[in-house]
């Protein structure tokens, strides 16, 4: 009997705080970051098929690799190796429906890898716990463990070492998507170049951010948003300055480049304010698409029969 296809929904992330240290011996940078999972999601389905491989649909699908470099396919291989299976016998097919921006600094590829791990764990009836899956996830990519966990978390090391963080509030965001993506390695390289030439400002300590999250006050949190990669992203994409300025002028409490960019995230006081900011920002001509999101939300989770009841995140095309 052929197993029933398994579908997993997995969220995007935004970095509320991202402190980038110097380059380590392994080539990675030491990070201190605060992740929050947002209500922008991909859906990943795995099933047994005669032809193994990956298919991608949704916004930006043409830019997503479908070969061995795809993180979801790396997840298939990694899990197969861990449990001694051959993913080609019988074949595993991965179908990705994109709702998270591609190359946008919101960990869409990592999210797909996390979803593939969880889905295959059920398809193959491996009964691995989340901690064991998280260990495999960390070997695939720095952001993959958080996509599994979701919520709000403090990340250290490469970002893969996670501690859950208390957030007493639903935080409301407006997400501005740029017309073109940025590749994460290039942004880190640009930050290294900027630091060699000058001493760009670095974000402060993380403890005040954790206190603001515990307080549940978006105004307090807005004062503390910070991202060491923002200077590099803006250097590579100068138009982001205009986007960040436009979001604040539209009424957001604060704006930040999400991760390595170029997506910009704007924190708002409440849901109504987010809708107003999104409407004004969409008419400013500074980005391709505007979406409204909230967080924190859970990490990767199985999709059951609630699909018809699931709200679609609002978006406006500029």
Swiss-Prot record:
It comes from the Bacteria. It is an enzyme of class 2 (transferase). Its EC number is 2.7.1.148. ATP binds at residues 101-111. Pfam families: GHMP_kinases_C, GHMP_kinases_N. One of its GO terms (molecular function) is ATP binding. Keywords: ATP-binding, Isoprene biosynthesis, Kinase, Nucleotide-binding, Transferase. The active site is at residues 13, 143. Residues 298-318 are annotated as: Disordered. Pathway: Isoprenoid biosynthesis; isopentenyl diphosphate biosynthesis via DXP pathway; isopentenyl diphosphate from 1-deoxy-D-xylulose 5-phosphate: step 3/6. GO terms for biological process: isopentenyl diphosphate biosynthetic process, methylerythritol 4-phosphate pathway; terpenoid biosynthetic process. Coiled coil: none annotated. It catalyses: 4-CDP-2-C-methyl-D-erythritol + ATP = 4-CDP-2-C-methyl-D-erythritol 2-phosphate + ADP + H(+). Belongs to the GHMP kinase family. IspE subfamily. Catalyzes the phosphorylation of the position 2 hydroxy group of 4-diphosphocytidyl-2C-methyl-D-erythritol. HAMAP family: IspE (MF_00061). This is 4-diphosphocytidyl-2-C-methyl-D-erythritol kinase. It comes from Saccharopolyspora erythraea (strain ATCC 11635 / DSM 40517 / JCM 4748 / NBRC 13426 / NCIMB 8594 / NRRL 2338).
């Amino acid at each position: 009997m052929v197993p029933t296809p398994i579908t997993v929904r997995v969220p995007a992330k935004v970095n509320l705080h991202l402190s980038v240290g110097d380059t380590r011996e392994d080539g990675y940078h030491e990070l201190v970051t605060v992740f929050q999972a947002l209500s922008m999601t991909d859906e990943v389905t795995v099933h047994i098929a005669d032809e193994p491989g990956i298919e991608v649909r949704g916004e930006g699908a043409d830019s997503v690799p479908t070969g061995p470099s795809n993180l979801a396919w790396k997840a298939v291989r990694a899990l197969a190796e861990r449990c001694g299976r051959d993913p080609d016998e019988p074949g595993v097919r991965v179908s990705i429906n994109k709702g998270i921006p591609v190359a946008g600094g919101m960990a869409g590829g990592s999210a797909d890898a996390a979803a593939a791990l969880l889905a295959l764990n059920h398809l193959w009836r491996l009964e691995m716990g989340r901690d064991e899956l998280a260990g495999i996830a960390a070997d695939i990519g720095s952001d993959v463990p958080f996509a599994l966990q979701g919520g709000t978390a403090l990340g250290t090391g490469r970002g893969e070492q996670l501690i859950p963080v208390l957030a007493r509030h639903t935080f409301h965001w407006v997400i501005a998507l740029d017309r073109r993506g940025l590749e994460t390695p290039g942004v880190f390289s640009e930050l290294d170049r900027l630091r060699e030439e000058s001493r760009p400002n670095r974000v402060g300590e993380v403890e005040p951010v954790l206190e603001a999250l515990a307080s549940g006050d978006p105004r307090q949190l807005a004062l503390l948003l910070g991202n060491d990669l923002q200077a590099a992203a803006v250097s590579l994409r100068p138009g982001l300055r205009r986007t960040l300025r436009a979001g604040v002028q539209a009424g957001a409490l604060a704006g930040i480049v999400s991760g390595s960019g170029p997506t910009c995230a704007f924190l708002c006081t409440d849901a109504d304010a987010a809708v107003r900011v999104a409407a004004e920002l969409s008419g400013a001509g500074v980005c391709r698409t505007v979406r409204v999101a909230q967080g924190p939300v859970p990490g990767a989770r199985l999709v059951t029969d609630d699909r018809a009841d699931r709200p679609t995140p609002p978006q406006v095309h500029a």
